[in-house]
Amino acid sequence: MPTLWIVLIVVAVVVIWVIAIYNTLVKLKNNRENAFADIDVQLKQRHDLVPQLIGAVKGYMEHEAGTLTAITEARNKAMGASSINEKIAAEKELSGALSGFNIQVEAYPDLKASSNFMQLQTELSDIENKLAAVRRFFNSATKELNIAVQKFPNVLFASMFGFKEEEMFDLGDTRAAHEKAPEVKF
């Protein structure tokens, strides 16, 4: 009889331990999804601003139709993405298109003098700053989840429960354009 009790206690401890691992992984996954919800709010605001921005520049940038089309297509793709990883990839593309747009705007001094355009640019800049802040929070939550998935003994059960390492929301190739200091010419 004592052997049976020992076996039952060991089995109970193992079951409780596995449940604790599962619950920890679920909590971390939910934290990541909640962090992305904050990003989603800012992305929606950016998506809503893009048509206004394009409308404001159409008259000035007649020769840049390809750029404006690329921005519109990237926006539509981003709005149509459903999973977090699809949205991340689509938003990288939109960020790249907007970055290229900002570079081309430099060639249009009349456009830069437009108060409507400048207001939209300021709004876009504010949204980008908010996005940077919530992206840091999202990446922190993603990092915590990835570490938990990689740690032993969690790694033994994570894939069995459907948990895997998740993608961070970095700027990818557009990072250099966002981080490059503006060139000042006199």
Q: Where do the PLM segments sit?
A:
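A helix-centric hydrophobic-segment signal that preferentially recognizes long
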Residues: 1-186
